[in-house]
């Protein structure tokens, strides 16, 4: 979101599950972004209030489930972020159809992890177009940071010895 700067005037962020919609909206608010959730478990008055705030520009980020997005009429959405790859390729078309309306420019971004590759392939098959990939910037930043720390560590430990101990590699399923 930050990388887009002023180009991102407003955005809809899609999640596959209502629980994730709430979590993402809460996290964005915690980090200073003007965001609110919209999904079927919210009462109609709350959904109407949230949608009206998004339409009139009082709310910059709308975090939504697919069901909430169907029939959503917001004439000017600059960005769509797919927090999750949709399980059904048709949902992707509905999601990205929220941006770039009436001849306006719009941008859609999707976060895809290896377990979502099949769904991504289904989407590309449906739209008959390969979706461009961006380098994993977070992974690259960590790699550069690690490289810098390693170089700094070599300088700091020039005259010390290191011992290695073998540790168990129990991985948790986060």
Q: Where are the language model's segments positioned?
A:
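Arginine-glycine-rich low-complexity intrinsically disordered regions
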Residues: 142-174
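Conserved helicase RecA-like core
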Residues: 1-142, 164-167
